[in-house]
């Protein structure tokens, strides 16, 4: 993984290119992020930079985290994430990362937590076909058989069944940057990004 940045999903809109074509895009408020720590092979076993994002009141953080941030003279930051890389020579503690890292046309990977749908059934969660709705059928939205009989005498792990839908980490790869607004720290990315408006977004090259 190469260097990246944290941000917040603003929402979706449309963007018109030079030919007048309408492109569905997601607007992401990125950074500015602060490098709070640089990890090295000699001390940590791998090379990485730790990035902090979204300043909050000191009361929101515990003392160990505040002490860690004071070492890098960083303000109280709500989110800390790491980006592992081959070399950290181009970075230093307290360095500010913003939209300058990216260029129009560049492909990026975007990770976020998908929208939670709660406890969902077989049709909504796994796209099962439903049963007959009439002629005396009592099997409208049931799964049908979930296994064999005495042998194996159990339901195999991983069987598609009803349960929690969404609210898990999702990564969309190779999203193209359509436009960059450096004044307002906005990235405009072609396509959809996981999560609700306001969700934390992790971006990497």
From Swiss-Prot:
Disulfide bridge map: none
Keyword Thylakoid set for record: no
Region annotation Disordered: where it falls in the sequence: 129-154
Stored InterPro entries: Ribosomal_uL3 (IPR000597), Ribosomal_uL3_bac/org-type (IPR019927), Ribosomal_uL3_CS (IPR019926), Transl_B-barrel_sf (IPR009000)
Domain of life: Eukaryota
GO molecular function: rRNA binding; structural constituent of ribosome
UniProt keyword annotation of Chloroplast present: yes
Family annotation (PROSITE patterns): RIBOSOMAL_L3
GO BP, sorted A to Z: translation
Compartment(s): Plastid, Chloroplast
Major site of localization recorded for this protein: plastid
Keywords assigned: Chloroplast, Plastid, Ribonucleoprotein, Ribosomal protein, RNA-binding, rRNA-binding
GO CC terms: chloroplast; cytosolic large ribosomal subunit
Primary role: One of the primary rRNA binding proteins, it binds directly near the 3'-end of the 23S rRNA, where it nucleates assembly of the 50S subunit.
Name under which the protein is recorded: Large ribosomal subunit protein uL3c
